């Protein structure tokens, strides 16, 4: 079994490193040749995971031809806004790989497409060869082999089962799902709500406010999931609620951090600079989610206020207080129907 993880950021590095436990041939591919050389020299990703030594068996390269030769599974750990360009550029090398696993969490701004849709379009492959791995998972804790549970989803449940067996580790339990739409929607939109939670913390609004934002944010995520035909229970699982809780409450969360810094008075640009080159997908997904809500007339007040703070310079305090002045509503959407059977 030969697996290549494309993208040498924190999550790509962590996942590639721990997969060496299985005895497979694992390659980590990075775009920047100079950075890859430094990582190889030190056996440490000083750019995104400083302080963690890499498994001696992990191969690291910037050579795309070597990284794709005789590979069984390609895992993409690439920011969603750059995924399509990466696939276009390297399509000729990726053509012979059997399975493609996305780990990115976002929605493409220009097309409002999910990552699995982008992979299918650009590589011209059937959905049964495409999967998404998602759920509550910080790279540092994965490197430390602390217990976690995540989910792998594919439209073909046999594909999900096959990849589940291959990728599960002694400390990493992977569940399977055939609701790739729900898994990708949950993974993307929770980042926007995490920014809102961070803004609330930055403003010093306390635990009550954050709990309300997380809970009502989950409702907004579910509205979009249902719009696209996902199963509501998926959003209550690891890729939805699980990841939402993690990302909205931890100092390790980039999206929460961006929100907190903005709540404390920094501009978006200043907050992003504090991440030192790391990506907070929620900043971009806020645009995608806002466009989806506008085009489909989906009520998403938290998402819309986050968008206004990030892109229309609305005061963070005014944005969160405006949520309290919305029309009083029933807690459960009046047109919500769900048949358990």
Swiss-Prot record:
The active site is at 190 (proton acceptor). Sn-glycerol 3-phosphate binds at residues 105, 135, 137, 190, 243, 253-255. Keywords: Cytoplasm, Lipid biosynthesis, Lipid metabolism, NAD, NADP, Nucleotide-binding, Oxidoreductase, Phospholipid biosynthesis, Phospholipid metabolism. InterPro entries: 6-PGluconate_DH-like_C_sf, 6PGD_dom2, G3P_DH_NAD-dep, G3P_DH_NAD-dep_C, G3P_DH_NAD-dep_N, NAD(P)-bd_dom_sf. Its EC number is 1.1.1.94. Transmembrane segments: none annotated. One of its GO terms (biological process) is glycerophospholipid metabolic process. NADPH binds at residues 10-11, 31, 47, 105, 139, 254, 279, 281. It is an enzyme of class 1 (oxidoreductase). Pathway: Membrane lipid metabolism; glycerophospholipid metabolism. Pfam families: NAD_Gly3P_dh_C, NAD_Gly3P_dh_N. GO terms for molecular function: glycerol-3-phosphate dehydrogenase [NAD(P)+] activity; NAD binding. It is found in: Cytoplasm. One of its GO terms (cellular component) is cytosol. Its main location: cytoplasm. It catalyses: sn-glycerol 3-phosphate + NAD(+) = dihydroxyacetone phosphate + NADH + H(+); sn-glycerol 3-phosphate + NADP(+) = dihydroxyacetone phosphate + NADPH + H(+). Belongs to the NAD-dependent glycerol-3-phosphate dehydrogenase family. NCBIfam families: PRK00094.1-2, PRK00094.1-4. PANTHER family: GLYCEROL-3-PHOSPHATE DEHYDROGENASE, GLYCEROL-3-PHOSPHATE DEHYDROGENASE [NAD(+)] 2, CHLOROPLASTIC. Catalyzes the reduction of the glycolytic intermediate dihydroxyacetone phosphate (DHAP) to sn-glycerol 3-phosphate (G3P), the key precursor for phospholipid synthesis. This is Glycerol-3-phosphate dehydrogenase [NAD(P)+]. It comes from Dictyoglomus thermophilum (strain ATCC 35947 / DSM 3960 / H-6-12).
């Amino acid at each position: 079994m030969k697996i290549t993880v494309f993208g040498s950021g924190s999550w790509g590095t962590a996942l590639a490193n721990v997969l060496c436990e299985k005895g497979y041939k694992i390659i980590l591919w990075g775009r920047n040749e100079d950075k890859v050389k430094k990582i190889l020299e030190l056996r440490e990703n000083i750019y995104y995971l400083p302080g963690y030594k890499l498994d001696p068996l992990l191969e690291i390269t910037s050579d795309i031809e070597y990284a794709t030769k005789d590979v069984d599974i390609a895992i993409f750990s690439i920011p969603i806004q750059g995924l399509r360009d990466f696939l276009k550029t390297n399509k000729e090398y990726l053509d012979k790989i059997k399975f493609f696993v996305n780990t990115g969490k976002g929605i493409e701004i220009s097309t409002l497409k999910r990552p699995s849709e982008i992979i299918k379009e650009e590589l011209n492959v059937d959905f049964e060869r495409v999967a998404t791995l998602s759920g509550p998972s910080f790279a540092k804790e994965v490197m430390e082999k602390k217990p976690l549970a995540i989910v792998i989803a594919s439209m073909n449940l046999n594909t999900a089962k096959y990849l589940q067996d291959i990728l599960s580790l002694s400390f990493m339990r992977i569940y399977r799902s055939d609701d790739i739409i729900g898994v990708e929607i949950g993974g993307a939109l929770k980042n926007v709500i995490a920014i809102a939670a961070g803004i609330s913390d930055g403003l010093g609004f306390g635990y009550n406010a954050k709990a309300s934002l997380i809970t009502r944010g989950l409702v907004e995520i579910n509205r979009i999931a249902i719009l696209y035909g996902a199963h509501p229970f998926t959003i209550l699982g690891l890729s939805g609620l699980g990841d939402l809780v993690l990302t909205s409450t931890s100092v390790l969360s980039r999206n929460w951090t961006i929100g907190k810094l903005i709540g404390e008075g920094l501009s978006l640009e200043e907050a992003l600079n504090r991440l030192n080159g790391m990506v907070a997908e929620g900043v971009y997904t806020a645009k995608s989610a806002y466009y989806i809500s506008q085009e489909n007339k989906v009520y998403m007040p938290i998402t819309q206020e986050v968008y206004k703070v990030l892109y229309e310079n609305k005061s963070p305090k005014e944005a969160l207080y405006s949520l309290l002045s919305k029309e009083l509503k029933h807690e459960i959407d009046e047109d919500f129907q769900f048949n358990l059977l």
